[in-house]
Amino acid sequence: MTEIRDDSISIALDAMGGDSAPDVVIEGANLVLSGVVPCDGKVHFSIYGKKEEVLPVLAKYKLVEANSVFVDVSDAVSSSDRPSYALRHRRRSSMWHAVEDLKKGLVSAVVSAGNTGALMAISRHLLGTIHSIDRPAIAVAMPSQKSSFVVLDIGANIECSADALLQFAIMGVAFAKAILGRTDPKVGLLNVGSEEVKGTYAVQEAFSLMRAAKSKMDFYGYIEAEEVFKGEVDVVVADGFSGNIMLKTTEAVANLLMSLFKGVVKSSITAKIAACMLKPSVRKTMELVDPKLYNGAMLVGLNGVVVKSHGSADGKAYACAIKTAVHSARYAIVSKIASEISEMG
């Protein structure tokens, strides 16, 4: 394999993680390198996996082979592994070695479509957390009628204290500034209603804490799931249980609508002609709601860039996760989040 230039971003890929690994992982890398899913600047990869499974796939993608180094490992994290088991027994896995090399500074970011709980546990164990952060969260950007917003947590912390939700809000503000380019992000707390008496005890307590911190953040108040896509807020804070359900329901509805639309287009010659006439506008609208293009959630609060791809991602979706990792690493998202957290106290 060719020598890698020093001015490029190095991304570690867990080739054993995901429903269709390693094929989707290598395909995603190829889409990035070929410019189908463009990234900022030059990119090269460190690919971690079992050689008997990865090398035959890698041989089919000469562009990836020429712009990567392969690291042979003897183990892989299973989708059924509990986080504690992965910490004790998966230290020879592709996921562990990828995160460990990030800790050593050998790569700039890690992308994995593997077991979420194991990825969070291994990353937290090896990288540690940003100062003053107790519980890292998983954050992802989503589209709205006005622009886009970030939602966290989407699955790392099923149950959260009020203090944890406040920390999520602070990290969300930092993420929105660094990734979305917002100057004064508005924060909404996901709830079942807008009245102060609604919600769990932790959510009500978090509401009080965020309102008290209004001098440090623009707190919108409670926001219901039906309102988040109107673009009224830049950051949606939720516990991992609620956030994950909101995310996956949204993705399912988006996929349903896209499927229904395609069915209508194929239903008649008139519909096909109309679709052809409106093709540019239709494509643009479809891209705005395509879950694949928003694949790639960042584990925020860690001392390193770790991006989680959907386990069911296809090549294009995985490439978008790589794009998120490249952008986050190139623009020093971790140091920017740490700086924002320090300023907000």
Swiss-Prot record:
Entries under HAMAP family matching the protein: PlsX
Gene it is expressed from: plsX
Family matches, as InterPro entries: FA_synthesis, Phospholipid_synth_PlsX-like
One Pfam family matching this protein: FA_synthesis
Quaternary context: Homodimer. Probably interacts with PlsY.
Main location (coarse class): cytoplasm
Highest taxon above the source species: Bacteria
PANTHER family per the UniProt record, alphabetical: FATTY ACID/PHOSPHOLIPID SYNTHESIS PROTEIN PLSX (PTHR30100), PHOSPHATE ACYLTRANSFERASE (PTHR30100:SF1)
EC number: 2.3.1.274
Role according to the record: Catalyzes the reversible formation of acyl-phosphate (acyl-PO(4)) from acyl-[acyl-carrier-protein] (acyl-ACP). This enzyme utilizes acyl-ACP as fatty acyl donor, but not acyl-CoA.
Organism encoding this protein: Anaplasma phagocytophilum (strain HZ)
Listed name of the protein: Phosphate acyltransferase
Protein's UniProt keywords contain Cytoplasm: yes
GO BP: fatty acid biosynthetic process; phospholipid biosynthetic process
Record keywords: Cytoplasm, Lipid biosynthesis, Lipid metabolism, Phospholipid biosynthesis, Phospholipid metabolism, Transferase
Cell location: Cytoplasm
Pathway: Lipid metabolism; phospholipid metabolism
GO cellular component: cytoplasm
Reactions it catalyzes: a fatty acyl-[ACP] + phosphate = an acyl phosphate + holo-[ACP]
Keyword Transferase: yes
